[in-house]
């Protein structure tokens, strides 16, 4: 019996060792992919564009590359972008003209598409200041200027009586993580209070309690709007933004926050709904519940879903046995279909707000935010294999 136990233990050690070696090989392969994809994007985009959502979403992925690999080239690329934009989003200094409906000019300071950059600035501040907290009125230390505008804008926004700032699903990714990041820097509890208040408003206009999914905005709520086959029309990238937002918020939110369990329940319900409508090939169609509405693969939604699901598995909030097959299929799609031989990321639906029947999305369809989403997913896959 002792000899049999010894053989069993030896076999277990051997299998564990083989698994660890295989995982390490996969980690090295994925690390190479991350660097190939990021180098391809940065080498073909040496200019630093404005601090609008599409560029900023890429930089959230680029910063994840730095956090995972300690890649100073990635760090410098985002830092140079921040400097180019004066550590600001929209640049108006006249608060009387600040707006938060859709707009791309400098008075749209309160619009979330000009606030996702604040996530990147907060991360850069934490790196450069070694996570030095900022108390009310603190401006003396040498890195405070990097988030001075971020704090100015968000604290002005929180001082207003309005709660309808997040009126579209993308906005949850754009700004929810800003609130938790700034809470951790300033320790101002108002960030968490307003996080919940603004999120509650968003839920009231675009959350579908039956499915656990989010409509892109109030225009698309069923039955006012339907897919081509009369179904509820949930836009994959829109729900991808939300699932990724939950992952980022839960990562930063204090464990004793009074609303943490509610965020977690919404996240887990959405994760289950997302997993249930994955296509056999591993991707999600642009209209999640009606594959015929805009058939074929799409990368940005798929990558955000992959990131959001992997984060939950890595942090004990999603059952690995249940979700591993989902992310493995998604990862196979991302690396064998979306990833092109030269490091480009294809099949990214262009900028928009809905699944469009007949819209061409192919291997040549790429964009900054799609690359950022891919990098988020890839970094989280490395962490999964390392565990």
Please give the residue ranges for each predicted region.
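Asp-box/WD-like beta-propeller blade repeats and closely related beta-sheet repeat scaffolds
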Residues: 134-176
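CBM-like carbohydrate-recognition segments
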Residues: 26, 30-56, 63-120, 124-127, ...
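Extended ligand-binding clefts on enzyme/binding-domain cores
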Residues: 169-170, 180-288, 295-306, 318-350, ...
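Bacterial Sec-dependent N-terminal signal peptides
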Residues: 1-25
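His/Met- and acidic-residue-enriched segments that coordinate or traffic transition-metal cofactors
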Residues: 32-50, 60, 89, 101, ...
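Acidic-glycine-rich active-site phosphate/pyrophosphate-binding loop
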Residues: 29-36, 84, 90-91, 145-156, ...
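A broadly conserved amphipathic alpha-helix scaffold signal in soluble, globular proteins
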Residues: 119-125, 142-145, 149-152, 173-184, ...
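Helix-capping and short linker residues that terminate individual alpha-solenoid repeat units
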Residues: 46, 70, 86-91, 129, ...
């Amino acid at each position: 019996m002792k000899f049999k136990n010894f053989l069993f233990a030896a076999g277990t050690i051997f299998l564990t060792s083989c698994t660890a070696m295989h995982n390490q090989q996969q980690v090295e392969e994925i690390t190479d992919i991350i660097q190939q994809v990021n180098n391809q994007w940065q080498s073909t985009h040496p200019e630093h564009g404005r601090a609008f959502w599409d560029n900023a979403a890429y930089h959230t992925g680029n910063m994840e590359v730095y956090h995972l690999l300690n890649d100073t080239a990635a760090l410098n690329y985002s830092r140079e972008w921040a400097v180019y934009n004066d550590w600001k989003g929209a640049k108006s200094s006249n608060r009387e003209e600040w707006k938060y409906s859709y707009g791309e000019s400098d008075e749209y300071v309160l619009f979330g598409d000009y606030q996702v950059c604040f996530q990147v600035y907060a991360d850069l501040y934490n790196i450069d200041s070694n996570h030095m907290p900022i108390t009310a009125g603190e401006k003396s230390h040498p890195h405070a200027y990097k988030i001075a505008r971020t704090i100015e804008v968000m604290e002005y926004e929180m001082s207003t009586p309005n709660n309808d700032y997040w009126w579209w699903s993308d906005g949850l990714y754009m700004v929810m993580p800003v609130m938790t990041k700034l809470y951790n820097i300033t320790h101002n509890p108002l960030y968490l209070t307003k996080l919940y208040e603004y999120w509650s408003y968003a839920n009231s206009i675009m959350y579908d309690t039956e499915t656990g999914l989010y409509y892109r905005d109030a225009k698309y709520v069923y039955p006012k709007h339907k897919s081509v086959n009369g179904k509820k029309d949930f836009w994959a990238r829109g729900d991808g933004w939300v699932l990724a937002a939950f992952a980022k918020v839960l990562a930063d939110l204090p464990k004793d926050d009074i609303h943490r369990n509610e965020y977690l329940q919404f996240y887990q319900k959405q994760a289950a709904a997302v997993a249930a409508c994955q296509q056999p090939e591993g991707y999600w169609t642009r209209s999640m519940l009606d594959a015929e509405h805009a058939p074929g693969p799409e990368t940005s939604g798929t990558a955000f879903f992959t990131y959001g699901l992997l984060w939950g598995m890595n942090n004990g909030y999603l059952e690995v046995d249940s979700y591993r097959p989902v992310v493995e299929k998604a990862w196979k799609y991302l690396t064998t279909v979306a990833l092109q031989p030269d490091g480009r990321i294809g099949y990214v639906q262009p900028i928009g707000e809905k699944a469009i029947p007949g819209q061409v999305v192919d291997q040549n369809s790429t964009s900054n935010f799609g690359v950022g989403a891919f990098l988020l997913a890839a970094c989280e896959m490395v962490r999964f294999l390392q565990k």
